[in-house]
Amino acid sequence: MRPILIAGNWKMHKTQAEARQFLREFRPALQASSAGVRPQRQIILCVPFTDLAVVVEETRGSGMAVGAQNLHWEDQGAFTGEISGPMLAELGVRYVIVGHSERRQYFGETDETVNRRLAAAQRHGLTPILCVGESLQQREQGLTESWIVGQLDRALPGIDLRNLVIAYEPIWAIGTGKTCAAAEANRVIGLIRQHLGADHLPILYGGSVKASNIDELMAQPQIDGVLVGGASLDPQEFARIVNFQALTPAAAAAP
């Protein structure tokens, strides 16, 4: 059985003081929104580099895991502004996002550098969360499947699929309020799983995930969790997302 992963990507939000305040509010909200953290649901907080040490310390013993949002492919060197795998591992970080569309769009990330970052993460015992997804133009041109397959084929040579998470994030749904229909997200994730031939591989959905759509998303058989952006910044809403109540197939299909 594949694990259920609920990952929050804070992006460039929250100072250390704000991170501590979030956790102070999140823990009781988690208890109040349901019966507490279900043991089969892994919470991952992917926070800015400056918050990593604080969040690792504050969540110690809680069952939550901490993730970074990027890493360099080299272990050390003259790479101003970068962070390496050994630095993250020493802090107690367990996950790292690689290839997010914002990194690709704003910082020139390519499938080649994604591959090198994935290898670096695994080399140091980190579990990478590989982000893939199509633009609105590619979707409208019927290129969704071929584009994503190309991303996977270029990013994954030499990568151990046993220590990997994939997040399907349609670019047109990130931060726009537009959510990919749950059934369509399920279809694309099923295609990813089939292409890789890895039934054990956890595959998440990301793109305007919020409390109002989490139950329907998690009712889909191929979706193993979510990568949450803006909604993960609010402790009450993120607690509700973690404590989703998956709809029955009939309810999920209802208009």
Curated annotation (Swiss-Prot):
Compartments, as annotated in UniProt: Cytoplasm
One GO term describing the cellular component: cytosol
Active site residues per record: 100 (electrophile), 169 (proton acceptor)
GO BP: any one term: gluconeogenesis
Pfam families in alphabetical order: TIM
GO-annotated molecular function: triose-phosphate isomerase activity
Binding site for substrate: 9-11, 175, 208, 229-230
Main location: cytoplasm
Name of the top EC class for this enzyme: isomerase
Entry's EC annotation: 5.3.1.1
Catalytic activity: D-glyceraldehyde 3-phosphate = dihydroxyacetone phosphate
This protein's UniProt keywords: Cytoplasm, Gluconeogenesis, Glycolysis, Isomerase
Associated pathway: Carbohydrate biosynthesis; gluconeogenesis; Carbohydrate degradation; glycolysis; D-glyceraldehyde 3-phosphate from glycerone phosphate: step 1/1
PANTHER family: TRIOSEPHOSPHATE ISOMERASE
Subunit: Homodimer.
Function: Involved in the gluconeogenesis. Catalyzes stereospecifically the conversion of dihydroxyacetone phosphate (DHAP) to D-glyceraldehyde-3-phosphate (G3P).
Family classification: Belongs to the triosephosphate isomerase family.
Name of the protein in its database record: Triosephosphate isomerase
Organism this protein belongs to: Synechococcus sp. (strain JA-3-3Ab) (Cyanobacteria bacterium Yellowstone A-Prime)
